[in-house]
């Protein structure tokens, strides 16, 4: 390889396969090998890097290093924009992401860490490398595992609906956390979902309760937690393939574990303690803020939205108080508007409606158990008339109706108008005669 160094090792002096005789040739040989490895690791290595451009496909058949330089400054409308480098190959490849070309050179140098990490890296035939909007440069190395492997690399900048959905989920959890913490549907659905996703973690947690304290088995449990998290991540990455090939087993697992989780949730029941409900509410709201921040690609806009959400949530009652105070001040400053007087027809209609309503309420009270019938009958003059009224008869007798019509009905009104007109005409006649009498007296 370019930049390497060849080390010539002289044969050791003395008997033995390692030359451990006179002169210590074995030790010298080991030192020379180690020094050669160090020189090999620290030597300058030239790396052939291919610069990627957006929406341009780069196809290769051998291991290659790539770099992408982001020159665009993010704007406010890029809050849900994601930049990704897609590597799609016909066979399995190993992809390593680094920050710059210097890190690519370090990957080419020999080290124990690079040697072992190469075996731990996942091999995929279709993967995406996320690039930050504020990242100036991102580099990656694609290593082929088998010969005749053809792969393509492309940079994609697009609107990511997943970021938008994560942001909406955060808004819902933050503003509806108090309602969700008291909802039975949310309680059972969340319990079943956690049971299905984290069944291995729950089993390990239950086993840890039966283990004695200060036991070496905790080392195994810690390893089990890590292994469970790795399995969950692996399943989610290959969920589509698992569903296509093993949908019967996956469906059986979901139904079985979901029923068991529902049974456990049903046994303990929803939260009833107010403090527990408050803790769940705060937890949901904190998760909502985290989702809101992770769902927006521009940090300062995400922080601004979080501050606005906090102010909107916590200043709800002060804002209502200020609004009510403002309305009262405005009403006090306005000139009082005189009330509109009712017309004679409106007054008559309103009187009839209110009278009928009051009579119905009186009948309902008399028929209710709260009314003392004997005490009421002892206080009235006509018990039979009262009984007829309670049964639905009119509260007035025909004689009372005729008297009312004579006094306040249409005939009485006409008579009153005639009397008023006669009195007015008499006053006018007396006024017309007064000037003549005054004039005669003046002449005499």
Curated annotation (Swiss-Prot):
Signal peptide residue numbers: 1-43
Chain positions with Phosphoserine modification: 368, 424-425
Ranges where the record places region Required for nuclear localization: 336-444
GO biological process: erythrocyte enucleation; erythrocyte maturation
Sorted UniProt keywords: Erythrocyte maturation, Glycoprotein, Membrane, Nucleus, Phosphoprotein, Signal, Transmembrane, Transmembrane helix
Stretches for region A: 186-297
Region (B): 336-405
Localization per Swiss-Prot or TrEMBL: Nucleus inner membrane; Nucleus envelope
Residue positions with a glycan: 125
InterPro entries: NEMP_fam
Transmembrane stretches, start-end: 161-181, 186-206, 216-236, 245-265, 289-309
Pfam families for this protein: NEMP (PF10225)
GO cellular component terms listed in the entry, alphabetical order: nuclear envelope; nuclear inner membrane
Modification(s) after translation: Phosphorylation may regulate its interaction with RAN-GTP.
Membrane disposition: Multi-pass membrane protein
Described purpose of this protein according to its UniProt entry: Together with EMD, contributes to nuclear envelope stiffness in germ cells. Required for female fertility. Essential for normal erythropoiesis. Required for efficient nuclear envelope opening and enucleation during the late stages of erythroblast maturation.
Domain-related comment: The transmembrane domains are required and sufficient for its oligomerization.
Family: Belongs to the NEMP family.
Binding partners and assembly: Homooligomer. Interacts with RAN-GTP. Interacts with EMD.
Protein name per Swiss-Prot or TrEMBL: Nuclear envelope integral membrane protein 1
């Amino acid at each position: 390889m370019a930049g390497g160094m060849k080390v010539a090792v002289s044969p050791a002096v003395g008997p033995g396969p390692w030359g451990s005789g006179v002169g210590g040739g074995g030790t010298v040989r080991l030192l020379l090998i180690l020094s050669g490895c160090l020189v090999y690791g620290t030597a300058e290595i030239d790396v052939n890097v291919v610069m990627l451009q957006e929406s341009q496909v780069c196809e290769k058949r051998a291991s290659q290093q790539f770099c992408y330089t982001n020159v665009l400054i993010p704007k406010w409308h890029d809050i849900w924009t994601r930049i990704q480098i897609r590597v799609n190959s016909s066979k399995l490849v190993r992809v390593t992401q680094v920050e710059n070309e210097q890190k690519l050179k370090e990957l080419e140098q020999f080290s124990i860490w690079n040697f072992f990490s190469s075996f731990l890296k996942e091999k995929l035939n279709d993967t995406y490398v996320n690039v930050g909007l504020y990242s100036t440069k991102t580099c990656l190395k694609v290593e082929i595992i088998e010969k005749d492997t053809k792969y393509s690399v492309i940079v994609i900048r697009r609107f990511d609906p997943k970021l938008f959905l994560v942001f909406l989920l955060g808004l819902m959890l933050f503003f509806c956390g108090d309602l969700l913490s008291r909802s039975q549907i949310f309680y059972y659905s969340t319990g079943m979902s956690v049971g299905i996703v984290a069944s291995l973690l729950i089993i390990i947690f239950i086993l840890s309760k039966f283990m004695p304290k200060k036991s070496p088995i905790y080392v195994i449990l810690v390893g089990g937690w890590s292994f469970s998290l790795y399995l969950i991540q692996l399943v989610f990455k290959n969920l589509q393939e698992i569903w296509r090939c093993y949908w019967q087993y996956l469906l059986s697992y979901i139904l079985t574990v979901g029923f068991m989780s529902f049974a456990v949730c049903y046994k303990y029941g929803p939260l009833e303690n107010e403090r527990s409900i408050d803790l769940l509410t705060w937890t949901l709201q904190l998760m909502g803020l985290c989702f809101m921040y992770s769902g927006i690609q521009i940090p300062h806009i995400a922080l601004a939205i979080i501050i606005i959400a906090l102010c909107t949530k916590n200043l709800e009652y002060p804002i209502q108080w200020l609004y009510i105070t403002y309305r009262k001040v405005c009403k006090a400053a306005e000139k009082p508007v005189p009330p509109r007087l009712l017309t004679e027809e409106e007054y008559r209609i309103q009187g009839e409606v209110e009278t009928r309503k009051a009579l119905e309420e009186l009948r309902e009270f008399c028929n209710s158990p709260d009314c003392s019938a004997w005490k009421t009958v002892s206080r009235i003059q006509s018990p039979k008339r009262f009984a007829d009224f309670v049964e639905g008869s009119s509260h007035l007798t025909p004689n009372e109706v005729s008297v009312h019509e004579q006094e306040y009905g249409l005939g009485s009104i006409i008579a009153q108008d005639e009397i008023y007109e006669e009195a007015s005409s008499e006053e006018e006649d007396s006024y017309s005669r007064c000037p003549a009498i005054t004039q005669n007296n003046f002449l005499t």
